[in-house]
């Protein structure tokens, strides 16, 4: 297994730059004053398809040979990777098949179909999406592009942190949402090269703490599909590639509750006029857990995406759940 390096992130950046948005870096004076720190949000909710996933998908599809492109690609995803592969394939005239769970957010399903992909549904609690995807790939000769455990996907995801660090300079800490580990591992490659002294934290839902268990035990831990509002982090385990990078480059894995995610969503909407999906707030909520240690520090937080059904969003942020004090 050849693990990707920062050199692969650089190559990915050059390969996809004509397709991706250079997403904005957002700040809040009020938040900085309250925390006594400089906080920089990387707004991947403003990326094409509304999430960082487009970076890795575009890099992976772009690297396919003409022969593989002609046969088509297949991916399995709860939503953002599905849209990312569908759009990447459309831009490069590659047929795409996407395996999506029956309970995937309607917004994400509709967007994926809108990009022209063929969608196959499955039950995420009783069926194995990876097995379905690999079987279809073998039967039809599709190129399988998994949502996180793929060198080209990891390299593409790392371009977000690369942009952040190039814009704001070296950081003392970086907080990154964690599902399967594609964004965290890619971000770690970038941060270790561009900001060697930066502490890197992955943040996942309490209900899905397989990453934390894996990090502390030294081997990949598998769990049942977690029930959490962070649908983009409903993964059962880290990948072989992502875990190898995380184990060597990440300082710690934190967990946060759904209530903490809601509080962060509410703050971003009310104070910064930014709409994000629950998964995007994992890094923000994790930073708040460490706020006493961040006083006087320069901190990066990646907001991973903004694909959330508006009715669901309104229900979540209008609730009375208590979260961390911001």
Curated annotation (Swiss-Prot):
Transmembrane portions of the chain: none
Keyword Ligase attributed: no
Entry GO MF terms: ATP binding; D-serine ammonia-lyase activity; L-serine ammonia-lyase activity; magnesium ion binding; pyridoxal phosphate binding; serine racemase activity; threo-3-hydroxyaspartate ammonia-lyase activity; threonine racemase activity
InterPro entries: Ser/Thr_deHydtase_PyrdxlP-BS, TrpB-like_PALP, TrpB-like_PALP_sf
Enzyme class: lyase
Cofactor, how bound (note): Requires a divalent metal cation such as Mn(2+), Mg(2+), or Ca(2+).
Key words, A-Z: Lyase, Magnesium, Manganese, Pyridoxal phosphate
Residue ranges that the Swiss-Prot or TrEMBL entry lists as coiled coil: none
NCBIfam families, per the entry: PRK07048.1
Protein name (record): L-threo-3-hydroxyaspartate ammonia-lyase
The gene coding this protein: SRY1
């Amino acid at each position: 297994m050849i693990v990707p390096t920062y050199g692969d992130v650089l190559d990915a950046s050059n390969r996809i730059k004509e397709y991706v948005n250079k997403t904005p870096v957002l700040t809040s004076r009020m938040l900085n004053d309250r925390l006594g720190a400089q906080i920089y949000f990387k707004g991947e909710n403003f990326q094409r398809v509304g999430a960082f996933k487009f970076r890795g998908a575009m890099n992976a599809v772009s690297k396919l040979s003409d022969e593989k492109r002609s046969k088509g690609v297949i991916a399995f995803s709860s939503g953002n990777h599905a849209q990312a592969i569908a759009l990447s394939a459309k831009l490069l005239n590659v047929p795409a098949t996407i395996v999506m769970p029956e309970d995937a957010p309607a917004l994400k399903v509709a967007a994926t179909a809108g990009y022209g992909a063929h969608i196959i549904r499955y039950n995420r609690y009783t069926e194995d999406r990876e097995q379905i995807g690999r079987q279809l790939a073998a039967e039809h000769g599709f190129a399988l592009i998994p949502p996180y455990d793929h060198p080209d996907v990891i390299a593409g995801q790392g371009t977000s942190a690369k942009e952040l660090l190039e814009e704001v300079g070296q950081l003392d800490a970086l907080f990154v949402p964690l599902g399967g580990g594609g964004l965290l591992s890619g971000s770690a490659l970038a941060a270790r090269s561009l900001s060697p002294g930066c502490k890197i934290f992955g943040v996942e839902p309490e209900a899905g703490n397989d990453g934390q268990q894996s990090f502390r035990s030294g081997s990949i831990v598998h769990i049942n599909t977690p029930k959490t509002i962070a649908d983009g982090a409903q993964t059962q385990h880290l990948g072989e590639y992502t875990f190898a990078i995380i184990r060597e480059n990440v300082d710690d894995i934190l967990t946060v509750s759904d209530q903490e995610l809601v509080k962060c969503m509410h703050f971003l909407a009310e104070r910064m006029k930014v709409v994000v999906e629950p998964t995007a707030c994992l890094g923000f909520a994790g930073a708040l857990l460490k706020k006493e240690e961040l006083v006087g520090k320069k901190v990066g937080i990646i907001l991973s995406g903004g694909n959330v059904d508006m009715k669901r969003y309104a229900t979540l942020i209008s609730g009375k759940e208590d979260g961390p004090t911001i």
